[in-house]
Amino acid sequence: MKKIRIQLLIILLFAGCSLSLMAQKKEISQVKQMIKKSNNLNQAEQIMRDLLKDSANINNDKVWNTLFDVLNKKYLNGNEALYLKRPCDTTLFYNNIAEMFKVAICFDSIQVKANKPQKEINKSREKYANMLLSTRANLFNGGVFFIRKKDYNNGFDLLSLYITIAQHAIISSYNLPQKAKY
């Protein structure tokens, strides 16, 4: 009788896990569709952040990559609006850039902590480094923007992120502190 209960418990446990994985895949594919259509990006970001609240997903590369893709799409939409002189919430634009950097740093730290193979870590670092380096100047611009608006906390946060990202492992191979001209 005990053996049957244990077997039943194991079956229910596996069934619950498989349902959770199926729901996760469904949510990720739904978010990818939102990214393609470029609509409801705030909702897409919230879906991915809710997935990351579950400890089972914290080491899931797909969830982190999809969250980064959502933030990147929001950045690209804001950048396009600014370039075409369309109305854009500049505060939201700069805060989104900071979030993009924070997500990349957090994901990199989780990969290192999870003892993933160095080849896999380097591959994702290179992917993120190229994107982050092309937008890094906007951290500085955002910091100056917030300081001019007398929002010193946000300004300091963006400028601090601009400085510290140069020493982070994602971008450290580019030797930014040595290349900086004063």
Predicted regions located by residue number:
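Bacterial Sec-dependent N-terminal signal peptides
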Residues: 1-34
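Secondary-structure transition/capping residues
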Residues: 5-8, 42, 154, 173
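Generic macromolecular interface patches on structured domains
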Residues: 18, 77-78, 172
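TPR-adjacent "capping" and linker segments in tetratricopeptide-repeat scaffold/adaptor proteins
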Residues: 21-28, 122-141, 173-182
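Post-signal peptide N-terminal segment of secreted/secretory-pathway proteins
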Residues: 35-154, 160-163, 167
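Solenoidal tandem-repeat scaffolds enriched in leucines and small polar residues
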Residues: 155, 162-182
